[in-house]
Amino acid sequence: MTTISVVIPTLNEEQALGQTLANLPSSLVLEIILVDGDSTDHTQAVANAFCTATPNARIIRAPTGRARQMNEGAKASRGAVLLFLHADTQVPNDAPRIIESALTDPAVVGGRFDVRFDTCSGWGRIISTFMNWRSRTSGISTGDQGIFVRRHTFEQLGGFADIPLMEDIDFSRRLKRAGSTVALRQTVRTSFRRWEQQGPLRTILLMWTLRFLYWVGVTPHQLANWYQTVR
């Protein structure tokens, strides 16, 4: 069975992290690396408690920044396959089997899951349906879809670019050029909180604007400065 290393970057995620960790499949094929970016809440306490009770889990520290944290987690891991999860994203119980099956074709270098939100809201269903359709047609994945990749491919690509935004989009574009990728129909469950905080419509417009500006050449650092201003 393929060894899968799960890498979870954290920053002030005390409320969401516990549920994510509790729902990780209890499988010996999993190695769990929690990478904290200097949280100021109780995230590290939640992570430490989990690692104490889970032999194949450990926590490391890294400079704040999702791309940096994921890269450090990958360096610290040993698995032949890397699965990157957001701290508020839960995988299906049979995720290891699903990923291993997807990678039986040697031409496949990685992929992602479909996403659904932890809400009964109609907005949640509409947004997740569009996200999954867009990703399936474009081949571009976002971090909340549970991106997985063969280790040797990840290393050949140099990991995630050290940028403050769009690291998942940038990585997906490069991953597509490295080989075949799969868009799994099985779903991960992720939090709808980001959409609720500012309202679905406002968040949709913000995300579309950021993506458009990125595609036309605005740098992630410029986008990050603008994003902090308009939030």
Task: Describe these PLM feature segments.
Residues 36-45, 89:
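A conserved acidic beta->alpha catalytic loop
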Residues 30-33, 44-76:
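Conserved donor nucleotide-binding strand/loop of the catalytic core
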Residues 15-19, 41-50:
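Acidic helix N-cap motif at the loop->helix transition within catalytic regions
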Residues 94-122:
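Conserved donor NDP-sugar-binding/catalytic core segment of glycosyltransferases
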Residues 12-26:
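Short, well-formed alpha-helical segments that are part of the catalytic scaffolds
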Residues 3-5, 31, 170:
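Cell-envelope/extracellular polymer assembly enzymes that use nucleotide-activated donors
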Residues 1, 173-231:
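Hydrophobic helical membrane-anchoring modules
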Residues 82:
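Short aromatic/hydrophobic "clamp" motif used to bind/position activated sugar donors
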